[in-house]
Amino acid sequence: MSKAVGIDLGTTYSCVAHFVNDRVEIIANDQGNRTTPSFVAFTDTERLIGDAAKNQAAMNPANTVFDAKRLIGRKFDDPEVQNDIKHFPFKVVEKGGKPHIQVEFKGETKVFTPEEISSMVLTKMKETAESYMGGKVTDAVITVPAYFNDSQRQATKDAGLIAGLNVLRIINEPTAAAIAYGLDKKEQGKGEQNILIFDLGGGTFDVSLLSIDEGIFEVKATAGDTHLGGEDFDNRLVNHFANEFKRKYKKDLTTNQRALRRLRTACERAKRTLSSSAQTSVEIDSLYEGIDFYTSITRARFEELCQDLFRSTLDPVEKVMRDGKLDKSQVAEIVLVGGSTRIPKIQKLVSDFFNGKEPNKSINPDEAVAYGAAVQAAILTGDTSSKTQDLLLLDVAPLSLGIETAGGVMTKLIPRNTTIPTKKSEIFSTYSDNQPGVLIQVYEGERAKTKDNNLLGKFELSGIPPAPRGVPQIEVTFDIDANGILNVSAVEKGTGKSQKITITNDKGRLSKEEIDRMVAEAEKYKEEDEKEAARIAAKNGLESYAYSLKQTASEKQFEEKVDASKRESLNKAIEETISWLDNNQSATTDEYEDKRKELEGIANDALKDLYAAGGVPGGAAPGGFPGAGGAAPGADQGPSVEEVD
């Protein structure tokens, strides 16, 4: 029996499970609860984790930390982090561009990273498993939202390491939930089935489209919002009641963190009640300045307060259907995961979207993710149960990955929704003569220009022997491991010089806002992007043509066979074109094309003589690399790598 566990590290609650005797056991904590609040509290005497931390939150708001998952792997100046900080009763400070949490612990000021806070929650889950299983637990599979980016995944893995865990694998929450749904189904021999996992938790939202066939779970597409969940619905209720309190009593309770915490706890309770009742009352004694706050709210009012948030959950559903190229009628089951899917309005929206099809509620929305992670942990540690035999998980990369080539173009090596693990290599070359090195800049995102995407990291490959532009061959390899974490390497074929980089979160990384903006804007800006791509192709085409003509014109037989005046006018035209290009980096497609026609006219006249005399140019045929990269040589902006078709 393996001692490996599956841990669902949630924004608001976490859960741990273990696969034993052909079944999954969800492990209850010391309070007897099967889920544990992702809360850590610091007092004058001790550190509390889980239920104990959450229970004292109102008395100690400034030193009770929660929602670390909303900060992990993000930059401090990320607008979402800034927005969250407004709601947090604890202090978030900036160190090295990243958010850190500042608390008072045992009488001194301490600063923790989000990874450290998450690692404390993981430690609690590890101890919960150890007390149940007897003995040490080190191997774990930890889940993350499918839409978590590279840096958030890496940071989550780091949190596991800090907690003393050997992180076997980072897997996506919806995929783990799909295992929970499909594990019992694989014996039924239903053939291939498309299922949609709709996972709306406390702080994150994911939608994944999978096909399940005889134990093979293949993710077709994934989308989501790493910053939408039950917490946001609670916030709407808190604001609603705070405003009501202000209207009734002319007092602003939002200045008092303790009152806010008590109100938030009451709101969370009211929200849950509204999933089963049409209305509920909120009663808080001595909420603020001795005032008892008694009020009520109906389900309809709650739905209206969160209307835009509820509706926004359908955008990723539409996106995965588009990306997966499936029709609504081809989805066999819609599986709801995450506590927030208990909200009747959410269920109705999903059902209406799929033309009245009822969502499947056969799995426990709070436990499904940990359940699937436990199954994966058992498989990875060599469990031989008949249940887990032949179970194969094929997940995907949520965002396209590529490098910047000349002209600031995003050259994608791995498109979004590519099955992982995956490895892809492409050959690039230098951009100017005798260039000694290239700068490889790695980006993620969906836009055509790298400036609109997210820079993951960069490295220099130097020591390239002097050679004309386009001659050295630089092979760039992207390798995404099964955790969705990227390694990039580059090797110069001639010398065998190589350089590699694991993209970790040295660079504070992407927010859901940016990711979502990228994909949403990518649709909107697709036309602009295409226009820009055509413009750069025209510019690069003209430049390659001018240089290949220049090479032809410098050859001996050209000088021997072509009339001197024609040679002179061609050389003059080439030099003029090259200098015009240097000064007109942002001309239009038409201007580049006109310039090329002009040059072609002069060139054809001279080349006629050459061909008539039987000389064929030994250099590259005029035309160069079609669609090759291009900031003009000598222009120092941007990288100096050129794509070779």
Swiss-Prot record:
Keywords in alphabetical order: Acetylation, ATP-binding, Chaperone, Cytoplasm, Nucleotide-binding, Stress response
Which Pfam family is one of those matched by this entry? HSP70
Domain of life the protein comes from: Eukaryota
The segments labelled Disordered in the record are 612-645
Q: Where in the cell is it found?
A: Cytoplasm
* Induction conditions: By heat shock.
A single GO cellular-component term from the record reads:
cytoplasm
* Gene field: HSA1
In which family does this protein belong, per the annotation? Belongs to the heat shock protein 70 family.
Q: What does this protein do?
A: Acts as a chaperone.
InterPro entries documented for this protein: ATPase_NBD, Heat_shock_70_CS, HSP70_C_sf, HSP70_peptide-bd_sf, Hsp_70_fam
Q: Where is the composition biased (Gly residues)?
A: 615-632
**Where is this chain primarily localised?**
cytoplasm
Name the chain's protein: Heat shock protein 70 1
User: PANTHER family under this entry?
Assistant: HEAT SHOCK PROTEIN 70KDA
- Molecular function as annotated in GO: ATP binding; ATP-dependent protein folding chaperone
User: Any idea which residues bear N-acetylserine here?
Assistant: 2
